Swiss-Prot record:
Belongs to the AP endonuclease 2 family. PROSITE patterns: AP_NUCLEASE_F2_2, AP_NUCLEASE_F2_3, AP_NUCLEASE_F2_4. This is Probable endonuclease 4. InterPro entries: AP_endonuc_2, AP_endonuc_F2_Zn_BS, Xyl_isomerase-like_sf, Xyl_isomerase-like_TIM-brl. It comes from Persephonella marina (strain DSM 14350 / EX-H1). Its cofactor is Zn(2+). Pfam families: AP_endonuc_2 (PF01261). SUPFAM superfamilies: Xylose isomerase-like. Its EC number is 3.1.21.2. CDD domains: AP2Ec. The lineage of its organism: Bacteria, Pseudomonadati, Aquificota, Aquificia, Aquificales. Zn(2+) 2 binds at residues 144, 177, 214, 259. The gene is nfo.
Length: 285
């Protein structure tokens, strides 16, 4: 079965992510561990953690994915911001391990005036420090593919390969975001473009290291370098790009997570649209 789900709210109590996932008929879910646009960290009670584990077992929703705060910038040249980001990631990863969350997705950082090579080095050094403080046994640390706006690092397979290289023995991997890669210049909505991107991933990162797919259409044109998500089939990617991913013999084994605009019942509608694109037999490569 192809697992399709959405990003859900974790407000009030973390265990409620499973209630919210069940309400929309999600097979898998993603959520924030704390407010993504605030440095404030909310400590979770033992009771809340126990409820989280209990509801996960009861609902059968799996895999479970946490997304990092948007404030973190592991590439920053500002030592205060970078240290704050490192400590924030450590805190979030420790909670992921405690709750046995499967995947932790992060936007690695922005160069903001640095050369790309310097920004990449800063990210690698930051992650080394993080892994010296947190040993990942249950959770995979996933770099998200990014659109390339405002100096984002992680927009190409080459950049992601550099970020992955020092951590081959760790629980690391990649989360592919369809909107981001399309906006970054990978034309995944035609056959040649999709298989070219698939081949690049395979050679430079290894398909086995791709763990999650963020399923988002794009409000902006191809190669726009802008991160603007749209409902499935209503953006410039169109249905074809999602059909390629959902029916690919490898990608269809992964969780597909919607991060489309949160209006009315659109998570339900978007999941239905994705499910209609699934064929019985995968397309072999």
């Amino acid at each position: 079965m192809v697992k399709i789900g959405a990003h859900v709210s974790s407000s009030k109590s973390l265990d409620l992510v499973f209630d919210r996932g069940r309400e929309i008929g999600a097979d898998t879910i993603q959520f924030f561990l704390s407010s993504p646009r605030s440095w404030h960290w909310k400590e979770r009670s033992d009771e809340e953690k126990e409820l989280f584990i209990q509801k996960r077992r009861e609902t059968g929703i799996s895999p479970v994915i946490a997304h990092s705060s948007y404030l973190f910038n592991l590439a920053s040249s500002d030592p205060v911001l970078r240290k704050k980001s490192i400590n924030g990631v450590i805190r979030e990863l420790k909670l992921c391990e405690e709750l046995k969350i499967d995947y932790y997705v992060i936007h690695a950082g922005k160069s903001k005036g640095l050369k790309e090579s310097e920004a990449v080095k800063n990210i690698i050094d930051s992650v080394k420090e993080i892994f010296s403080k947190v040993k990942l046994k249950h959770t995979f640390f996933l770099y998200e593919t990014l659109a390339g706006q405002k100096g984002e690092i992680g927009k190409t397979t080459d950049e992601l390969a550099q970020l992955m290289e020092p951590f081959k023995k760790e629980n690391t991997g990649v989360c592919v975001d369809t909107c981001h890669i399309y906006s970054a210049g990978y034309k995944i909505n035609d056959e040649e473009g999709f298989y070219s991107y698939r081949s690049e991933l395979s050679k430079k990162i290894g398909l086995e290291n791709v763990k999650v797919i963020h399923c988002n259409d794009s409000k902006t044109p191809f190669n726009s370098k802008r991160d603007r998500h749209e409902h499935i089939g209503e953006g410039s990617i169109g249905y074809k790009g999602f059909e390629f991913f959902l029916n690919d013999e490898y990608f269809r084994r992964l969780p597909f997570i919607l991060e489309t605009p949160k209006t009315a019942d659109w998570d339900i509608k978007n999941m239905e649209r994705l499910r209609r694109l699934i064929r019985t037999a995968p397309v072999a490569q």
